[in-house]
Curated annotation (Swiss-Prot):
The keyword Glycoprotein does not apply. It comes from the Eukaryota. Keywords: Disulfide bond, Secreted, Signal. This is Alpha-latrotoxin associated low molecular weight protein 2. Its main location: secreted. It is found in: Secreted. It comes from Steatoda grossa. Pfam families: Crust_neurohorm (PF01147). Co-purifies with latroinsectotoxin. InterPro entries: Crust_neurhormone_CS, Crust_neurohorm, Crust_neurohorm_sf.
Length: 97
């Protein structure tokens, strides 16, 4: 049983690490799939994509990420995500007793 738990733990860590490594590897296909033209550079695309990813994590749903990326990050969803993330950052931290 212990071996099984260890294997599952290691597999989880590897998948998390792999996903983090791939996060910064955006390609020309990403530009096309997000309906972006060449006027946006890859760094700007990465930053906007991070906003959508963080927003999806905040709302605990993947459907947000697709809507956020619509029309090269110009949708109302993207604006709402930016606003929600900014509001979340401005919330006072809860004190732990």
């Amino acid at each position: 049983m212990f071996k099984l738990i260890c294997i599952v733990f290691i597999a989880t860590i590897l998948s998390i690490t792999s996903a983090a490594d791939n996060e910064d590897e955006l390609t020309i296909e990403d530009f096309l799939s997000y309906e972006c033209n060449e006027s946006m550079d890859i760094e700007e695309l990465k930053e906007k994509d991070k906003v959508c990813s963080r927003c999806a994590n905040l709302h605990k749903t993947q459907s947000v990420i697709e809507r956020c990326r619509l029309n090269c990050f110009t949708s109302e969803y993207f604006k709402n995500c930016e606003d929600n993330l900014q509001a979340k950052e401005e919330e006072p931290e809860e004190e732990t007793l």
